[in-house]
Amino acid sequence: MNGPALQPSSPSSAPSASPAAAPRGWSEFCELHAVAAARELARQYWLFAREHPQHAPLRAELVSLQFTDLFQRYFCREVRDGRAPGRDYRDTGRGPPAKAEASPEPGPGPAAPGLPKARSSEELAPPRPPGPCSFQHFRRSLRHIFRRRSAGELPAAHTAAAPGTPGEAAETPARPGLAKKFLPWSLAREPPPEALKEAVLRYSLADEASMDSGARWQRGRLALRRAPGPDGPDRVLELFDPPKSSRPKLQAACSSIQEVRWCTRLEMPDNLYTFVLKVKDRTDIIFEVGDEQQLNSWMAELSECTGRGLESTEAEMHIPSALEPSTSSSPRGSTDSLNQGASPGGLLDPACQKTDHFLSCYPWFHGPISRVKAAQLVQLQGPDAHGVFLVRQSETRRGEYVLTFNFQGIAKHLRLSLTERGQCRVQHLHFPSVVDMLHHFQRSPIPLECGAACDVRLSSYVVVVSQPPGSCNTVLFPFSLPHWDSESLPHWGSELGLPHLSSSGCPRGLSPEGLPGRSSPPEQIFHLVPSPEELANSLQHLEHEPVNRARDSDYEMDSSSRSHLRAIDNQYTPL
């Protein structure tokens, strides 16, 4: 593994190379060296972890993936640079070509170590007698003139000639040639940045256009390079579009990367292996790779460049919260039923307490109900309830929220983030408030991967209702308002237009003490369906009362005249 393995070793060095028997084939050869490399890598892994406790330890799988990528790159480079000049490594073991047998034996000449370092085998060959001018000779001359040498190779050639005679050392820089006279820029240039990782991926820019029309995936080449900087070598991330382009479309230093993380299933439900890259003062970019191995490899590389470990990200996603409802005493699967409501009376995280007052006054906010319950609420009527939604607290990320909506009979979940000022972020769009976000998705379709065929707009929402004490016969009854603008909701009309709403600004009857599900009894998601006689009496009683009267019961009135109970006219009422 440490030497050029494809070159045949000399008979004198073969017995001392290894006490074991020589491998009988390439498979045994690869297995022998893989075992040795794995043993050495594991030893160095534990040694580095003990000597550098300040670095967060990476899992062995991520280390092996990164080691495999780097090993393949450096191994191919060593084999390419270490083989004999003018010979392909695939010709190892074959006899010399036929032309070599007919060629005359070269006479004794200067030894090979005395020659200056060159880039091709033509300069290592002995001088040939001048022949007639031909096209091949002219092409070789032009190739020699226009050949570009990096800046690092010019001192090496001078150093290689230094151990020889003083005449040779002085003769090398004394022959500038035509290239130095007429083409001085072709002799030296800045060395190209070293490629640490490179692959062709699909990417999408998370901007306003992509949010309105859906994600537009493009093919590009993502390259992670090590470039020289004023404070030492720095790592640079470059995106080339098209992939074979020589100039990057986007370029950013790894020090300017603010966040790199996996995309959750809520953000990319139809794309499994995606990660998002957030660069300072740039548009967020979503990348998609082919499989999980490539995803973990890229995440390990980028996390190492930014100085953020992967363990903290994974712990945030997978560690369950001790304050999660219905999870402290029994598993989630055994308690997720419609007969058990969430209990918001317990203590919440400080992050939840800072942002809950922005949403607690609205009837579409259901608090800490589970993902299964939210899905059951929005998909009760199947495809007929297309666009019905509710907002709830996130189960896995405390302090964040989820927009659950019905898409052709299937529940979809979209994660929301709120700042301390009430500003809302959905995927990569920012809104002044959650209400502005809901109005946006009422007018514009929610972007899904399937494009125009998956058009879904928010049409109505499920209202939070509570179960009266002492009631035992209940029927699942989600309320929904097909027209939920400020004109159709006299009780919440002024509040829906507010970008930020504190708990003190809740309308009368909807204060935190009087909110359904916010009082001392636990929140329930049921409602009693009254008898036809009671509904008729309620209609007669409501005709003589003012329209703007505060709500006295849990029944929601129609938006036009407020004279019809939503329990009758609601097209989403289950039979």
UniProtKB/Swiss-Prot annotation:
<feature type="modified residue" description="Phosphoserine">
    <location>
        <position position="330"/>
    </location>
</feature>
<keyword id="KW-0219">Diabetes mellitus</keyword>
<feature type="compositionally biased region" description="Low complexity">
    <location>
        <begin position="95"/>
        <end position="104"/>
    </location>
</feature>
<dbReference type="GO" id="GO:0090331">
    <property type="term" value="P:negative regulation of platelet aggregation"/>
</dbReference>
<comment type="subunit">
    <text>Binds to the tyrosine-phosphorylated TCR zeta chain via its SH2 domain.</text>
</comment>
<dbReference type="GO" id="GO:0036016">
    <property type="term" value="P:cellular response to interleukin-3"/>
</dbReference>
<feature type="region of interest" description="Disordered">
    <location>
        <begin position="322"/>
        <end position="346"/>
    </location>
</feature>
<dbReference type="GO" id="GO:0035702">
    <property type="term" value="P:monocyte homeostasis"/>
</dbReference>
<dbReference type="GO" id="GO:0005886">
    <property type="term" value="C:plasma membrane"/>
</dbReference>
<feature type="region of interest" description="Disordered">
    <location>
        <begin position="83"/>
        <end position="136"/>
    </location>
</feature>
<dbReference type="GO" id="GO:0070100">
    <property type="term" value="P:negative regulation of chemokine-mediated signaling pathway"/>
</dbReference>
<dbReference type="InterPro" id="IPR011993">
    <property type="entry name" value="PH-like_dom_sf"/>
</dbReference>
<dbReference type="GO" id="GO:0001780">
    <property type="term" value="P:neutrophil homeostasis"/>
</dbReference>
<feature type="modified residue" description="Phosphoserine">
    <location>
        <position position="150"/>
    </location>
</feature>
<feature type="compositionally biased region" description="Low complexity">
    <location>
        <begin position="325"/>
        <end position="337"/>
    </location>
</feature>
<dbReference type="GO" id="GO:0048821">
    <property type="term" value="P:erythrocyte development"/>
</dbReference>
<feature type="region of interest" description="Disordered">
    <location>
        <begin position="503"/>
        <end position="525"/>
    </location>
</feature>
<dbReference type="InterPro" id="IPR036290">
    <property type="entry name" value="Phe_ZIP_sf"/>
</dbReference>
<feature type="compositionally biased region" description="Basic and acidic residues">
    <location>
        <begin position="83"/>
        <end position="93"/>
    </location>
</feature>
<feature type="modified residue" description="Phosphoserine">
    <location>
        <position position="120"/>
    </location>
</feature>
<feature type="modified residue" description="Phosphoserine">
    <location>
        <position position="13"/>
    </location>
</feature>
<keyword id="KW-0727">SH2 domain</keyword>
<dbReference type="GO" id="GO:0046426">
    <property type="term" value="P:negative regulation of receptor signaling pathway via JAK-STAT"/>
</dbReference>
<dbReference type="GO" id="GO:1900235">
    <property type="term" value="P:negative regulation of Kit signaling pathway"/>
</dbReference>
<dbReference type="Pfam" id="PF00017">
    <property type="entry name" value="SH2"/>
</dbReference>
<dbReference type="GO" id="GO:0060218">
    <property type="term" value="P:hematopoietic stem cell differentiation"/>
</dbReference>
<feature type="region of interest" description="Disordered">
    <location>
        <begin position="546"/>
        <end position="575"/>
    </location>
</feature>
<feature type="region of interest" description="Disordered">
    <location>
        <begin position="1"/>
        <end position="23"/>
    </location>
</feature>
<dbReference type="GO" id="GO:0035162">
    <property type="term" value="P:embryonic hemopoiesis"/>
</dbReference>
<protein>
    <recommendedName>
        <fullName>SH2B adapter protein 3</fullName>
    </recommendedName>
</protein>
<dbReference type="GO" id="GO:0030159">
    <property type="term" value="F:signaling receptor complex adaptor activity"/>
</dbReference>
<dbReference type="GO" id="GO:1904893">
    <property type="term" value="P:negative regulation of receptor signaling pathway via STAT"/>
</dbReference>
<dbReference type="GO" id="GO:0035556">
    <property type="term" value="P:intracellular signal transduction"/>
</dbReference>
<dbReference type="GO" id="GO:0060761">
    <property type="term" value="P:negative regulation of response to cytokine stimulus"/>
</dbReference>
<comment type="function">
    <text>Links T-cell receptor activation signal to phospholipase C-gamma-1, GRB2 and phosphatidylinositol 3-kinase.</text>
</comment>
<comment type="similarity">
    <text>Belongs to the SH2B adapter family.</text>
</comment>
<dbReference type="GO" id="GO:0005173">
    <property type="term" value="F:stem cell factor receptor binding"/>
</dbReference>
<dbReference type="Pfam" id="PF08916">
    <property type="entry name" value="Phe_ZIP"/>
</dbReference>
<feature type="region of interest" description="Disordered">
    <location>
        <begin position="150"/>
        <end position="176"/>
    </location>
</feature>
<feature type="modified residue" description="Phosphoserine">
    <location>
        <position position="103"/>
    </location>
</feature>
<keyword id="KW-0597">Phosphoprotein</keyword>
<dbReference type="GO" id="GO:0051898">
    <property type="term" value="P:negative regulation of phosphatidylinositol 3-kinase/protein kinase B signal transduction"/>
</dbReference>
